[in-house]
């Protein structure tokens, strides 16, 4: 099983490799990837250094080209494919059908993965991507249960990648319109959920307020940790009560499901967080490396260590974790 870790910078990439990542995924410094924030991601020169470092240590580098090409501007996405291949990436993670077609026809030897943004949630969809574009792996959305993941593993021979830890999204990735509704821009087109140019913070007599395109998303009291203002994780007044009406900030943590993921034949476990710091990458990579190694050394004796959970909780969104949709009773 591959441990796939995020990097939004060269220091984060080196940290991931040094702490046991089998592969690292990154993006270019533009809107062709779904973590397009100021100060994040890689220029070609930085990416060249990243490739060298990863390959010197016997690991792999995946490049996310996982937004959808704008009308009349698809050349930029095709060029991203060209650059990724030329710079020596081991795999390209792509969502857009036309970009997949371009990559598969121009670079048939390149390993292609279907991005979570493509929202492939059934065996027929996965077979389509395999037959049309010869994809080797599909990244599954975080809304599937373990029962559904197992079902897909039985019905396809395409490698499956699942999110194992990190920020949790309650939407089927690739299908969310909340950011578009609020700002006119979506992660699928500009590469950012709640684009930074629409974010504003303001100290008021009532507390620290976070706004997205002038709409109040949350208000924080003294000493309360403030989160990045995403619409789905805001607190809103409903019937006279103020609470997280859509989703409470929390992180996915599937350490307890590791035996099931192994037995299901999941090819790769993915850590979310290209927008997070090298310190986050270090902590999470180290814990997950230890857990995977412990299971492989003695599957029968595998147990989640309390210190693993404690270390992950410290870097979790909202300082709490959940199994998310993986453990839901309804299918």
PLM regions and their residue ranges:
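Active-site pocket-lining/capping segments in soluble small-molecule metabolic enzymes
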Residues: 1-120, 139, 143, 147-268, ...
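Conserved nucleotide-cofactor-binding alpha/beta core module
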Residues: 122-124
């Amino acid at each position: 099983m591959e441990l796939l870790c995020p990097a939004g910078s060269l220091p984060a990439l080196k940290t991931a490799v040094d702490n046991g990542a089998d592969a690292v995924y990154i993006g270019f410094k533009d809107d062709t990837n779904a973590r397009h924030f100021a100060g994040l991601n890689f220029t070609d020169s930085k990416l060249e250094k990243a490739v060298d470092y990863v390959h010197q240590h016997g690991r792999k580098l995946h490049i996310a080209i996982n937004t959808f090409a704008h009308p009349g501007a698809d050349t930029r996405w095709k060029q991203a494919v060209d650059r990724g291949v030329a710079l020596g990436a081991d795999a390209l993670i792509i969502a857009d059908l036309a970009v997949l077609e371009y990559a598969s026809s121009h670079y048939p030897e390149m390993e292609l993965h279907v991005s979570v943004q493509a929202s492939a949630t059934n065996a027929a969809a996965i077979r389509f991507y395999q037959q049309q574009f010869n994809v080797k792996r599909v990244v599954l959305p975080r809304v599937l249960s373990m029962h559904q993941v197992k079902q897909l593993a039985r019905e396809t021979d395409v490698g499956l990648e699942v999110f194992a830890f990190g920020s949790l999204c309650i939407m089927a990735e690739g299908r969310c319109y909340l950011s578009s509704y609020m700002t006119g821009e979506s992660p699928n087109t500009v590469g950012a959920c709640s684009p930074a140019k629409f974010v504003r913070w303001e100290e008021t007599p009532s507390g620290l307020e976070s706004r997205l395109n002038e709409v109040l998303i949350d208000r924080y009291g003294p000493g309360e940790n403030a989160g990045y203002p995403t619409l789905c994780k805001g607190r809103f007044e409903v019937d006279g009560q103020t609470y997280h009406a859509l989703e409470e900030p929390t992180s996915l943590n599937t350490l307890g499901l590791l035996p099931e993921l192994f037995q299901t034949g999941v090819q790769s476990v993915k850590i979310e967080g290209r927008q997070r710091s090298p310190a986050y990458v270090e902590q999470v990579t180290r814990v997950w490396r230890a857990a995977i190694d412990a299971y492989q050394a003695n599957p029968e004796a595998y147990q989640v260590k309390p210190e693993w959970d404690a270390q992950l909780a410290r870097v979790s969104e909202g300082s709490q974790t959940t199994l998310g949709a993986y453990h839901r009773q309804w299918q």
